[in-house]
Amino acid sequence: MELCTQTVAADHEVIITRRSGSHHPTLWGDHFLAYADLRGANEGEEKQNEDLKEEVRKMLVMAPSNSLEKLELINTIQCLGLAYHFQSEIDESLSYMYTHYEEYSIGDLHAIALCFRLLRQQGYYVSCDAFKKFTNDQGNFKEELVKDVEGMLSLYEAAQFRVHGEQILDEALNFTITKLKQILPKLSNSQLAQQITNALKFPIKDGIVRVETRKYISFYQQNQNHNQVLLNFAKLDFNILQTLHKKELSDMTRWWKKMELVNTLPYARDRLVECYFWCLGTYFEPQYSVARKMLTKISFFISIIDDTYDIYGKLDELTLFTQAIERWNIDASEQLPLYMKIIYRDLLDVYDEIEKELANENKSFLVNYSINEMKKVVRGYFQEAKWYYGKKVPKMEQYMKNAISTSAYILLTTTSWLAMGNVATKDVFDWVATEPKLVVASCHIIRLLNDLVSHEEEQKRGNAASAVECYMNEYSVTQEEAHVKIRDIIENYWKDLNEEYFKVDMIIIPRVLLMCIINLTRVAEFIYKDEDAYTFSKNNLKDVISDILVDPII
């Protein structure tokens, strides 16, 4: 455990030895300030983009409704990150497929699996009985299916959208993972091999749209049967959006420099760009530019407050800060030590800015939903601090109940909706505040994924017990056994999430809002796949961010 010394008292100096995270500094610094004057697409690029869009729209409309051609075109458009241009056309096509699903369930493995996955991905619950024809008398998938590599990959992706009680999809997932790994070394098609390798690590269910779009454009270009119009449109659209995202990050960097929080709080992770990346994974579309910047600011504060409770603040200070957050009044800052005053005042200032921005749409009252969730997050962090200072390892049930707050995902969901326009009504904010099962599943997934990859490092520096320690302590198992069990628990929460997604009335809770919840969960799957890539962003995340936010596609 590394220690640091810091002067913290507001009225007189008291030197206190504290824990430190020893986090590496920002990798980006002022880099994105260089894009402040970056121009968007010029007139020629805009016209080319519109022309290509109309060509693709015609392709989509002209493809026969009940054809494999239509299925594959929709899939390609989605994988190339272009679906947001054609949402109404895709919605109409998938609605037709849903009402005529039996017609699609008589094709080959690839066609059935692709249709099944596209419909479930859209929120339509369709039966998995169509896959029974591919099993033998013992209920096992037929070995001959391995000859159909495309079909196997489609079945693998389809099985990811399973819910509780669908044994055939559980079997399909195990079967395809095993067989695809065996097939890989024998494939002569390098493009297909790359695609399978990526899918085994990042299935479509877990994929961040912009990250997977960048990869798929490369895969698609290598495919000899690619459509040049689609490829050209995907490249141009990717670069146009990237320019917008660079400009947003330039704005965020100016905001970050103006606050100077990092210089004041050296113990905290300086991860502005990584916060923005997280929010970009939630929604990338141009109409959510303001929403992304709001969400990034709140995400940045969540990170700082998390570090304050996890490693730096003393229990008496954390008690005062928790009380101040509950009061939510600038006068409450007077009782705080200096470093906490800075956090508190800047946090309230950011919420004031958001409230003023939403006042233009008569939506300022919605900010209270985000503030209430911030209070819950801080209560959760404070509970963990009390466990730590009391040397208590809670039962898993206690820990997971508190994890709904400490995941901060209801706060992020609520904040992500603030600037999404009229689609985000008071009713949807009331709904998420009740902690519905879908949202709780998302919270638990992020909490457990984070704990699996970060608990060893956190225990070295002296953090509160994670889910791993809680499980080991309660059930008297080894760390390895706890990891295996927690992985199973995560899979069950994904089944909960899928199941609830199919049940939600999308007239009341529009799909575009539900996708914020799902996309936040996808970002967690990505960030915590092999390590805590947010904290240790210099290892692998830096290159991904460069691909998405720095380097255009040539």
From Swiss-Prot:
EC annotation?
Answer: 4.2.3.73, 4.2.3.47, 4.2.3.106, 4.2.3.-
Matching Pfam families: Terpene_synth, Terpene_synth_C
One Gene Ontology biological process: terpenoid biosynthetic process
Q: How is the cofactor bound?
A: Binds 3 Mg(2+) or Mn(2+) ions per subunit.
Tell me where the sequence motif DDXXD motif sits in this chain.
Answer: 306-310
Write down the chemical reaction(s) this protein catalyses. Answer: (2E,6E)-farnesyl diphosphate = (+)-valencene + diphosphate; (2E,6E)-farnesyl diphosphate = (E)-beta-farnesene + diphosphate; (2E,6E)-farnesyl diphosphate = gamma-gurjunene + diphosphate; (2Z,6Z)-farnesyl diphosphate = beta-bisabolene + diphosphate
SUPFAM superfamilies from the UniProt entry: Terpenoid cyclases/Protein prenyltransferases, Terpenoid synthases
Q: Which cofactor does it need?
A: Mg(2+); Mn(2+)
The entry lists its GO molecular-function terms as:
magnesium ion binding; terpene synthase activity
Q: Which residues bind Mg(2+) 1?
A: D306, D310
Positions with a binding annotation for Mg(2+) 2: D306, D310
Superkingdom field: Eukaryota
The record's listing under InterPro entries reads: Isoprenoid_synthase_dom_sf (IPR008949), Terpene_cyclase-like_1_C (IPR034741), Terpene_cyclase_plant_C1 (IPR044814), Terpene_synth_N (IPR001906), Terpene_synth_N_sf (IPR036965), Terpene_synthase-like (IPR050148), Terpene_synthase_metal-bd (IPR005630), Terpenoid_cyclase/PrenylTrfase (IPR008930)
| Pathway in which the depicted protein is active | Secondary metabolite biosynthesis; terpenoid biosynthesis
Q: Which UniProt keywords apply?
A: Lyase, Magnesium, Metal-binding
Domain topic, free-text comment: The Asp-Asp-Xaa-Xaa-Asp/Glu (DDXXD/E) motif is important for the catalytic activity, presumably through binding to Mg(2+).
Q: Which family does it belong to?
A: Belongs to the terpene synthase family. Tpsa subfamily.
Instruction: Tell me, in a sentence or two, what this protein's role is.
Output: Sesquiterpene synthase involved in the biosynthesis of volatile compounds. Mediates the conversion of (2E,6E)-farnesyl diphosphate (FPP) into gamma-gurjunene, (E)-beta-farnesene and (+)-valencene, and of (2Z,6Z)-farnesyl diphosphate ((ZZ)-FPP) into (E)-alpha-bergamotene and (Z)-gamma-bisabolene as well as beta-bisabolene, (Z)-alpha-bergamotene and (E)-gamma-bisabolene to a lower extent. Can act with a low efficiency as a monoterpene synthase with geranyl diphosphate (GPP) as substrate, thus producing beta-myrcene, (E)-beta-ocimene, limonene, terpinolene, gamma-terpinene and (Z)-beta-ocimene.
Question: What is the protein name given in its UniProt record?
Answer: Terpene synthase 17
